[in-house]
Amino acid sequence: MTKGENSIGVDDYFQDRGPTVTFSNLLYCVQETKFCRKIGPEKIILHDVSGIIRPGMNAIMGATGSGKTSLLDVLAGRKNPAGLRQGNVLVNGKVVTSDLRLSSAYVVQDDILMGTLSVRENLLFSANLRLNPKDHSTADKHQQVNTIIEDLGLTDCANTKIGTEFLRGVSGGERKRCSIGMELITSPSLLFLDEPTTGLDSNTANCIIGLLHKLSRRGKTVIFSIHQPRYSIFKQFDHLTLMHKGEVVYAGAADHALMYFTDLGYQIEPFNNPADFFMDITNGETKSTPHLLQTKLNCKNPLAIKYQQSQLYQNMMEELDHVNQSIVDGVTGEDKPANYTTSFFYQMRVVCGRTVLNTLRNPQTSYAQLALNIFFAILVGLIYYQMPLTLPEALQNSLFFKFHENSSGYYRTSVYFLSKIFADLIPNRMIPIIVFSAIAYYMMGLKPAFETFLCFALTMSLVSLAGVGLAFLVSASVSTFAMANILIALPFVFMMVFGGFLVNLNAMLSWLSWVKWISIFKYGLDALYINELKGLFLYSNNTTISGEYFLEQQGIDYSVWGFWRNVVALLGIIFVCMCLAYVQLRRINRWK
């Protein structure tokens, strides 16, 4: 984006009245890729799109794939600017930067709420992260939350949990209102919503639009995409932008749209919903005059051509030309990173607190996992209870190893990443593994020395964290659960084959022997072998074999450094996986 003397900061975006958003000649393209390789030509998502959006209810309507959500994202600054080939977006006639994402509000289509927290707790989480602690005391934040709850009609369910697949919670309409409330905490004058009525019944959808209409009458600029609203919803629109195949086919007053298309020769059936009528027109499912039928044969998108030839379009472009004259030609600047209202450590405290609370309230991720580890620890302990030191049984130690597994300017990517590690991944992996080790270790009759138990628990924890790090890297690199499940299974199977579980690594083909050095299981198994067998004697057919001899036959260095080398290797794998996962999160966080 361009920036110069006309660019503005966060505090200058909005006045008492909502801002006017203008956009001129937007051309947005995406490049289709497959396995990180570009395939085919660029696909045009938005083609020469222009418009003026003023305070009030502004609907962007169109069929699936028409480009309405893409236009909304471009206006909100949520699309990768690399795809914007031409055009600009202005707020009150001035160039905007990434700070717009912090001073406006954007409600996504799917409600992103913590299901184990109540409506009030979710709103308070938003207030804690988006209201500056220097300007707003704790009492001020609670007062703001209470005001939002009252304004959105959430008083009756304020202390009810949102709900998960295992926990019954609030209704769909209440979830949507809570999502809107999360964004209204900062009292923004510019509000974006992506299909706010999707998935709601007609009555609930009407209530949501009524809420937005009330907000718009307070001077806010409300911009939202919508598919095909009922008439009671449509009549609340002030401005309508109708999209078809990435182009605008009408932009103007919503109550003038019917007259515009009637003048083009389209005939609406009696008692038909105007919104349905407009969708039928764009889909080619309505009657038109012979003149329009001929026009359809001569161009790909006749509706867009007709709109660009209309006086309505010419008047709008004249106004846009006047607005664009204020932009300084030839001045460019970089889109600086957005400034957050709260510090890094304050964000860490709030996000970690929510993560811990979610873990404690979600039995599937805490108590059930701990109980499962205790169950398997007792089971393994009973199977190998007080195992004798005869050679066949001693070599079956490999049978009982256990391994386990998100922008609207709320907080930094690094805060999410570190809170995920310190408040979620480490407690959920290390505590169950330590409990597992404490039960199984002594039941199996392994070395009674406490330091060997600590080495056992340390190794098990590191192997688990290394597996989690690899899973975290894969999940941060792909966008679907199905693909993540496939990609995470392959390396684990690969590492098990070359980790010493299934074959003797010394008997492996020489040109494949290098593969063992990237196996998590190889380092974990070697460390456990050294920890248990060093200084131990195994008996078989009146023959005594030292543990050191067995380790030598396996090609395992049983020196002090030999053990800690495996620990360092596991720490290295954890560090590399976590760093790469963080890089992936940084890469995809802003625009996906």
Mark where each language-model region is.
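ABC ATPase C-loop
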Residues: 183-184
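Conserved catalytic motifs of ABC-family nucleotide-binding domains
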Residues: 98-99, 111-121, 135
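Catalytic Walker B motif of ABC-type/P-loop ATPase nucleotide-binding domains
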Residues: 191-195
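Alpha-helical transmembrane segments and their short interhelical loops
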Residues: 210, 218-225, 230-233, 239-242, ...
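Conserved ABC transporter NBD signature motif
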Residues: 51, 77, 84-100, 163-165
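Topological signature of polytopic alpha-helical transporters
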Residues: 1-56, 63-64, 88, 93, ...
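Short, conserved post-Walker A segment of ABC-type ATPase nucleotide-binding domains
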Residues: 58, 69-82
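Helix N-cap at the start of a conserved alpha-helix in ABC-type nucleotide-binding domains
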Residues: 202-203
